[in-house]
UniProtKB/Swiss-Prot annotation:
Function: Member of the two-component regulatory system ArlS/ArlR.
PROSITE patterns: OMPR_PHOB, RESPONSE_REGULATORY
UniProt entry keywords in alphabetical sequence: Cytoplasm, DNA-binding, Phosphoprotein, Transcription, Transcription regulation, Two-component regulatory system
Organism name: Staphylococcus epidermidis (strain ATCC 35984 / DSM 28319 / BCRC 17069 / CCUG 31568 / BM 3577 / RP62A)
Keyword DNA repair attached: no
PANTHER family: REGULATOR OF RPOS
GO CC terms in record: cytosol; protein-DNA complex
Protein name, per record: Response regulator ArlR
Organism domain of life: Bacteria
Keyword Kinase in record: no
Signal peptide: none
């Protein structure tokens, strides 16, 4: 399922876009405030961001800039600003596309399909030379395959799929061991250590960072 975040202060427009996207089987979150939108964007992984420029508290350009510092996820700007310098600024700040309001919803849907097609296949993830092939169920580093248990593999994949997003131990536990698991959160620390030990011969162990008091992130 493709997850999309819309940050748009025109609530009627945001709801209309949400309705159309939901009809196309996308999962949609909406924020009407710039700060809330930025917080949501940086706290949860999405497959696409749709941003207005003129927003309360934090403008869309700043949101675009901060998202682009963290991820290569596609960004589409939708705005009433039609001047060339506005378009140039939006694209220079990291947007993949720029649509001027008012627009036809079919055009927006087509542009969404286009930017999503340009994204690499998520079944193969490349994290600084750590290649994770979901279909083949294998991990290679510098051409060498790592011998991982299923739990180690699942843990690495979850972190990689949420690259640059800090995951709490409880979140990791839910994803890897299951929501009804009675495993304690310190087991996550144990398996992180296992993973780092297996990455150490390739000088990749520091790819998994500890965020003290919170959890882990892979960059």
């Amino acid at each position: 399922m493709t997850n999309i975040l819309i940050v748009e202060d025109e609530q009627n427009l945001a709801r209309f876009i949400e309705l159309e996207l939901t009809h196309e089987n996308y999962t949609v979150d909406i924020e009407n405030d710039g700060k809330a939108g930025l917080d949501k964007a940086l706290s949860k992984p999405y497959d696409l961001y749709i941003l207005d420029l003129m927003l309360p508290n934090i403008n869309g350009l700043e949101i675009c800039r901060q998202i682009r510092q963290k991820t290569t996820t596609p960004i589409i700007i939708i705005t009433a600003k039609s001047e060339t310098y506005d378009k140039v600024a939006g694209l220079d700040y990291g947007a993949d596309d720029y649509i001027v309001k008012p627009f036809d919803i079919e055009e927006l849907l087509a542009r969404i399909r286009a930017v999503l097609r340009r994204q690499p296949d998520k079944d193969v993830l490349d994290i600084n030379g750590i290649i994770i092939d979901k279909d083949a169920f294998k991990v290679t580093v510098n051409g060498h395959q790592l011998e991982l248990t299923k739990t180690e593999y699942d843990l690495l994949y979850v972190l990689a799929e949420n690259r640059n997003h800090v995951m709490q131990r409880e979140q990791i536990l839910d994803h890897v061991w299951g929501y009804n698991s009675e495993v304690e959160t310190n087991v996550v620390d144990v398996y992180i250590r296992y993973l780092r030990n297996k990455l150490k011969p390739f000088n990749k162990e520091k790819s998994i960072e500890t965020v003290r008091g919170v959890g882990y992130v892979i960059r």
